[in-house]
């Protein structure tokens, strides 16, 4: 039986909030089978839980938030959610003593390291996957995103940024997902933004944690970070990282082929909601035998060591 995963032990890290610029303590806790992914704000009394749920997602200019029925929100969840998807973590409680998850270096890599440091534990309960049965597509002007049936998890993402720092040959990235491929090829890709936008937001008391330490920063001509890019195509790789996190908002790894053109958090979420709303387009599946499991979800040695 392919089993659900959680953490072996509690781990903690500190970072800076993208919005407030203040120190945030992040605590990751193991959780029992069928708990799902729960984000929790401990700065509120009593603490407020936000279960990962496609219908609770709100996309703001700066980040992805989860919002509850009382309009209370937790912000900047997307990169940690991508790390959970990458390592196939089904059950976890994520606590922060702030309204947001720390931005760390703007990628998912610090969260991957934290999860691996906690260790991955298998629970004696079958892991549920969402398997795509029919093609579902959503559009917004010339932007689109779609899922097709596929025995694995493949991603094909194209951006269209007209900027001197982004070569036209580096605007598309495609991969067959696996935990190893995610860790090596995607997790280290950082978010990005224009210097002028960051300066404008900070002048209005927003994005106070934004800096060269947590993003690729560009002006009209070039990348301003001293160390440059981690990959020539880091921009599109980060958009794929975002998509992996967005699509895991249903709390389950997806078996299907994802293709997107100029998509972002809002359209990725619209696709996920469109799939889930169409009952005949998907099904829950479990696997009794490792041999039946798509290669995409075979546990790498690093994860279950």
Curated annotation (Swiss-Prot):
The keyword Iron applies. Gene3D superfamilies: lpxc deacetylase, domain 1 (3.30.230.20), lpxc deacetylase, domain 2 (3.30.1700.10). Pathway: Glycolipid biosynthesis; lipid IV(A) biosynthesis; lipid IV(A) from (3R)-3-hydroxytetradecanoyl-[acyl-carrier-protein] and UDP-N-acetyl-alpha-D-glucosamine: step 2/6. It is an enzyme of class 3 (hydrolase). Its cofactor is Zn(2+); Fe(2+). Keywords: Hydrolase, Iron, Lipid A biosynthesis, Lipid biosynthesis, Lipid metabolism, Metal-binding, Zinc. GO terms for biological process: lipid A biosynthetic process. One of its GO terms (cellular component) is membrane. Its EC number is 3.5.1.108. InterPro entries: Ribosomal_Su5_D2-typ_SF (IPR020568), UDP-acyl_GlcNac_deAcase (IPR004463), UDP-acyl_GlcNac_deAcase_C (IPR011334), UDP-acyl_N-AcGlcN_deAcase_N (IPR015870). The active site is at residue 265. GO terms for molecular function: deacetylase activity; iron ion binding; UDP-3-O-acyl-N-acetylglucosamine deacetylase activity; zinc ion binding. Can use either Fe(2+) or Zn(2+). The metal cofactor can switch between Fe(2+) and Zn(2+) in response to metal availability. Metal switching may be important for regulating the LpxC activity upon changes in environmental conditions. Has a significantly higher affinity for Zn(2+), but exhibits higher activity with Fe(2+). Can also use Co(2+), Ni(2+) and, to a lesser extent, Mn(2+). Due to its important role in lipid A synthesis, LpxC is an attractive target for the development of new antibacterial agents to treat Gram-negative infections. Many potent LpxC inhibitors with a variety of chemical scaffolds and distinct antibiotic profiles have been discovered. Catalyzes the hydrolysis of UDP-3-O-myristoyl-N-acetylglucosamine to form UDP-3-O-myristoylglucosamine and acetate, the committed step in lipid A biosynthesis. The N-terminus is required for deacetylase activity. The C-terminus contains a signal sequence necessary for FtsH-dependent degradation. Belongs to the LpxC family. This is UDP-3-O-acyl-N-acetylglucosamine deacetylase. The lineage of its organism: Bacteria, Pseudomonadati, Pseudomonadota, Gammaproteobacteria, Enterobacterales.
